[in-house]
Swiss-Prot record:
Protein name as catalogued: FUN14 domain-containing protein 1
Keywords: Autophagy, Isopeptide bond, Membrane, Mitochondrion, Mitochondrion outer membrane, Phosphoprotein, Transmembrane, Transmembrane helix, Ubl conjugation
Organs and tissues of expression: Widely expressed.
Species assigned in the record: Homo sapiens (Human)
Result after altering Y18A: Impairs interaction with MAP1 LC3 family proteins
Topological region Cytoplasmic: 1-47, 96-133
Modified residues (Phosphotyrosine): Y18
Domain of life where this protein originates: Eukaryota
Function: Integral mitochondrial outer-membrane protein that mediates the formation of mitochondria-associated endoplasmic reticulum membranes (MAMs). In turn, mediates angiogenesis and neoangiogenesis through interference with intracellular Ca(2+) communication and regulation of the vascular endothelial growth factor receptor KDR/VEGFR2 expression at both mRNA and protein levels. Also acts as an activator of hypoxia-induced mitophagy, an important mechanism for mitochondrial quality and homeostasis, by interacting with and recruiting LC3 protein family to mitochondria.
UniProt xrefs under InterPro entries: FUN14
One BP annotation, GO: mitophagy
Gene: FUNDC1
């Protein structure tokens, strides 16, 4: 038994309208934590007392500062040791540095960085605005984090 297919419908019509969405404005209006955690998350720390917020920020800041200090010491030791070995090798005659070539390469790198910095400025400004807004909305826990971070660096 043969079935009869209906004629194809014309889906394009004059009354179809589409809304144009500007993604840059959308991104500015919607905070990054809403995109990651959903709209119901919000700043959860506002539910806690000021003392609890300061303690939470202080403890997380201290942990971050302590880890930053340990990793920073290791990185500084590695970089400093590398420079020391390079200096010894240069003084002993194993390595000769072509300073004109180094200067040329550094100037080339500076030009490339300036070009890239001019292109990335809007994205960086948007990120800075979001971070500033986050800090303003959560000033208590942010100040606790900064204090804890500095204590973690000192310990």
């Amino acid at each position: 038994m043969a079935t009869r297919n209906p004629p194809p419908q014309d889906y394009e019509s004059d009354d179809d309208s589409y809304e144009v969405l500007d993604l840059t404005e959308y991104a500015r209006r919607h905070q990054w934590w809403n995109r990651v955690f959903g709209h119901s998350s919000g700043p959860m720390v506002e539910k806690y007392s000021v003392a609890t917020q300061i303690v939470m920020g202080g403890v997380t800041g201290w942990c971050a500062g302590f880890l930053f200090q340990k990793v920073g010491k290791l990185a500084a030791t590695a970089v400093g040791g590398g420079f020391l070995l390079l200096q010894i090798a240069s003084h002993s005659g194993y390595v000769q540095i072509d300073w004109k070539r180094v200067e040329k390469d550094v100037n080339k790198a500076k030009r490339q960085i300036k070009k890239r910095a001019n292109k990335a400025a809007p994205e960086i400004n948007n990120l800075i605005e979001e971070a500033t807004e986050f800090i303003k909305q959560n000033i208590v826990i942010s100040s606790g984090f900064v204090g804890g971070f500095l204590l973690g660096l000192a310990s």
